[in-house]
């Protein structure tokens, strides 16, 4: 069973600029850097990434889930318009304050903060990052009320706890996770996602 996210990868047209933005506005710190080994690039079926520079960043405190930024990316990339991994969801302390802090940065505000359900337990905001990657910045008032029950983070901007995936066939995707990883599944649940709706307006 898959239990914890250890690291996520994003492609960046400018790794140095991305590092600075994550450091200045998310409070993340660089923990390593290097180039993508050919063997690894082949293993993930992305041979074009072999030899590309990367750096890995972690939140200041709390659970250490890395974001590995790899040189690459498509200038025409648009979040939510491709299948596969679409967004990174981070636990944050105060979405309202974070919205103010991100003004004038390379992070562009999209929606929120808004409560996602009538229970008013999950307050979330969506922003796009320096390379158009989509972030959900989420605060749970009481994590014990969520079926995920994530470990709280003491950092203003904490760790990745959800990855959002676009799928052309939800049933097939759920069956894949059930068959190969024995993960518990919830849903599918009908739900209107504002940033997804706007992407196709």
Describe each model-derived feature in a short phrase.
Residues 1, 20, 24, 74-78:
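Polar low-complexity intrinsically disordered regions
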Residues 1-2, 80-81, 153-157:
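Short, flexible turn/loop "capping" segments at secondary-structure junctions
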Residues 4, 15-18, 126:
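Short N-terminal amphipathic alpha-helix/helix-capping patch enriched in small hydrophobics
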Residues 5, 83-87, 160-161:
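Eukaryotic phosphotyrosine signaling hubs
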Residues 9-10, 31-35, 65-70, 89-90, ...:
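Vicinal oxygen chelate
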Residues 10-62, 115-118, 165-201:
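Core segments of cupin and vicinal oxygen chelate
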Residues 31, 40-56, 62-85, 93, ...:
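Post-signal peptide N-terminal segment of secreted/secretory-pathway proteins
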